[in-house]
Design a protein with these regions (language model features):
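Bacterial N-terminal signal peptides
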Residues: 13-23
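Periplasmic-binding protein-like
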Residues: 32-40, 112-128, 180-183, 218-262, ...
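Bilobed "Venus flytrap"/periplasmic-binding protein-like clamshell domains
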Residues: 34-60, 97, 122-197, 269
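Ligand-binding clefts/hinges and TM-proximal coupling segments of bilobed small-molecule sensing domains
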Residues: 67-70, 147-162, 258-305
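Alpha-to-beta junction loops
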Residues: 85-94, 143-145, 184, 192, ...
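A ligand-binding cleft/hinge motif common to bilobed small-molecule-binding domains
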Residues: 93-106, 159-165, 197-225
Length: 305
């Protein structure tokens, strides 16, 4: 006759309970690290901004099973898209261009917009020297314009998209000695908005495109040397997105934490370090519709590599 062992069956019962809990609440057991991704050509610089931010979020999401934060920095979009689809990256913080590209590649969801103090929407300006003969965008045919870098929203994709809509054709200059056809606009990457403004001032290029907020800040007392010939639509400066299949409970708590960050001294300090973001707030995704249409129409021009 087999004797009943309470200890043995008690162990099975405990195991059964753990399995049920694992099935019902996988986020609470598996996800101990909240992973945030960013894109930058200088990983160390971006890491110093993003790590305090994601650690702050993880600390306030302990009830959801997170005990620490981690940052993944890439120089291009596809690696982040791949990892988000695999569930290895939870969040992404970036500008509209990179956020929309990830949405298209990895089916990410937009959560909130990050705004700077005094402005919840930014726009690009296309400018020339005040003594330039260029008055309109069409006058840039046969000339050279400076953009920031291929992943910049306000320093590249937004102003270039506007010019594409106006029927202008582009050519990327690989050297300063290349010829520019009279029916196309040539462009070079300055790799920094400050460089873009400087290049225009010194006559290295005829025109430049930057975020208007940066234009006001960088040009400073020399604004009278420059002249704006066109401006773009307005977009949120920053967007935080989350991966597909992230728990709705986590998303809800995350949204609450983000929207309250600016109300505490600790949160304010973290935000100030994060590209001078003032606070996170709701936004209508319809705000992005014109840009998403632009992205779809000219996706071949904005090669996501």
């Amino acid at each position: 006759m087999t004797k009943f062992s309470f200890k043995k069956w008690g162990g099975y019962s405990l195991l059964f309970i753990e399995i049920i809990f694992f099935i019902l609440f996988p986020e609470r057991i598996q996800a101990s690290t909240l992973v945030l991704a960013g894109i930058n050509q200088n990983p160390n610089n971006e890491l110093s901004k993003l790590l305090p931010f994601v650690n702050y979020l993880a600390h306030h999401l302990q009830s959801d099973g997170f005990d620490k934060g981690s940052v993944r920095i890439e120089k291009t979009i596809p690696p982040i898209a791949t990892l988000m689809k695999k569930g290895k990256i939870d969040l992404f913080l970036g500008g509209p261009f990179t956020s929309v590209a990830l949405h298209q590649l990895a089916k990410t969801n937009f959560l909130l917009q990050g705004i700077t103090e005094g402005s919840d929407k930014h726009y690009s300006v296309i400018f020339v020297r005040n003594d330039s003969s260029v008055k309109h965008l069409k006058d840039l045919k046969g000339k050279v314009i400076a953009f920031e870098n291929p992943l910049s929203t306000f320093g590249y994709s937004l102003p270039k998209g506007l010019m594409l809509e106006r029927g202008l054709k582009f050519k990327l200059l690989k050297t300063d000695k290349e010829n520019v056809a009279p029916d196309e606009v040539a462009y070079q990457f300055s790799n920094d908005d400050e460089n873009t403004i400087l290049w225009v001032k010194k006559g290295k290029v005829i025109a430049g495109a930057v975020d208007y907020e940066i234009y006001k800040l960088q040009a400073k007392e020399t604004l009278d040397q420059l002249r704006i010939i066109e401006k773009t639509i307005s977009l949120p400066p920053y967007i935080i997105s989350f991966r597909e299949n992230l728990s709705p409970e986590v998303v809800s708590h995350l949204k609450e934490v983000l929207k309250k960050m600016h109300q505490t001294d600790e949160g304010k300090a973290v935000l100030k370090n994060l590209n001078e973001i003032w606070k996170f707030q709701d936004f209508s995704q319809r705000t992005l519709s014109p840009f998403m249409k632009l992205y779809d129409s000219f996706s071949g021009e904005f090669k996501v590599k």
